[in-house]
């Protein structure tokens, strides 16, 4: 097997990743353990902090986003052990007992931290909380959670007519509501359910389509009472449950697996086994989309871990074919659209991704950025108002591209570079550490690069 040359350099406060695949003979091989699921890691930290007693989390993602969550809840009184191993212990403080912090809470780059936490902060009477984030997070819309919280009686102030962070939250007693969300968003749903923990009565969220359900599963595991109506995509939570600390085993993140599923599919002669991956049905849109494209993926050793379905994923290279991806599947693969765009480049025919306008308000405008950066590499890709149109079959050439400090962009471009001719340079590659601290090491491993 010929080797790629993969180098990561630090230059002037940024990391630059360069990837030079061999002219012939590259194939990806190996068995991978991927980082813990980011969505589940956030929720385990939050619920452990507000539950009574001890919570033990095994397999926690040690990325920057969960660290932001841990720091915020430490500042409000929870005792959380250092995030320097994948086993973390939390001494919870009990529901309704978050302390007023001495300083501003910083959510970093994490929209999940800020949006979910707002539901808890708004429902703690007689306490003032100030929340901010990095430049990217301060530009992301918060009205989608602030509006329903205000409907519950919350007092929240922010920039741009209370839509952008930094935010000030004056906690108070909230009233239960039935909120009909205009978008399928697990962050919106989870924020309202967490606010509902402290209300007198039942709080309901109805969505236009099913979004990921990690919050519902974990709330039930910690002792909350929920009524879930899958026919109407509605979830109801009863206020004032007794939450008890739990042992949580975090499965591998299917969003992180997606990079290797696509990489092994598009690099000829490849075969990877990705172990211990969460296959929650609200997250498996990526598997269904790749199946539509003809990918050779098998699920082995299916099992249940702490209420979440898990399997090992075996993927072998094959010729992908273009297809149209849209509708209700989009909320179930929203984070995987950038890497799906890469799959489309190497598929025969045309791939259309639609109904994904939500990607314009992620860590970057992911539709615009993927179109611009892949075009630099020679891809035939056109931006749509709510998606991308990709014509496959055009060989990629090396180029200098930019992550725009977006972790999923950085990693998607790295996978594209494996099939590009020449040396591709990815600027601001440090963004990958937000959700996948050892991404470059794993890339070197599967490519047989010992650098």
Swiss-Prot record:
BP-aspect Gene Ontology terms: amino acid biosynthetic process; aromatic amino acid family biosynthetic process; chorismate biosynthetic process
Entry annotated with the keyword Transferase: yes
GO cellular component assignments: cytoplasm
Localization per record: Cytoplasm
Pathway noted in the entry: Metabolic intermediate biosynthesis; chorismate biosynthesis; chorismate from D-erythrose 4-phosphate and phosphoenolpyruvate: step 6/7
Catalytic residues (positions): 335 (proton acceptor)
Keyword annotations of the record: Amino-acid biosynthesis, Aromatic amino acid biosynthesis, Cytoplasm, Transferase
Transmembrane segments: none
Family of the protein in this entry: Belongs to the EPSP synthase family.
Description of how the protein assembles with itself and partners: Monomer.
Name of the protein described by the UniProt record: 3-phosphoshikimate 1-carboxyvinyltransferase
Protein encoded by which gene: aroA
